[in-house]
Amino acid sequence: MIFKYAFGRPFKTDAVIKSFPLVNSLPDYIEMSQDKKSFTAKLGVDDIIYGLGESVRGINKRGFRYISNCTDDFSHTEDKSSLYAAHNFFVVDGEETYGIYVDFPGKVYFDFGYTDLDTLTVSVEEANYELYVVEGDNVMDIIKKFREIIAVSYTHLRA
């Protein structure tokens, strides 16, 4: 299942090509801040976080923080926190397994257990965005569902 939430007046990015009805209630594992600029989710001891596209560090993003800000930095090393490209999608694999896509063209801040190892926090510059929660049987199912709702990449990779 894919659930869509909208906050404020989202900027239309055309990243999501399928229509979904808006849902009012977030899943129990997500807690939204009063100003709608951030949300948190508790992490289990063994939870792994995948995603954010071509970013720094290893496969498991847990324990670090990242900024989605599309910087054009020729020397993109592991000590950088700002992502080279904006892929605001990640999957939590653990006690709760789900994917989250933040459809927002401005800065998005991801704290994946950096400040508090047991909590992931996602923040946006302003409360004008769409949030998609993707639930499925497993990580691959969640990724497949997400790929079906986003626009085709302008680059076509050959097998």
Task: State what each model feature region is.
Residues T155-A159:
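Conserved small/polar residues in nucleotide/adenosyl-binding loops
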Residues M1-Y154:
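Catalytic and substrate-binding clefts that recognize carbohydrates or anionic sugar/phosphate headgroups
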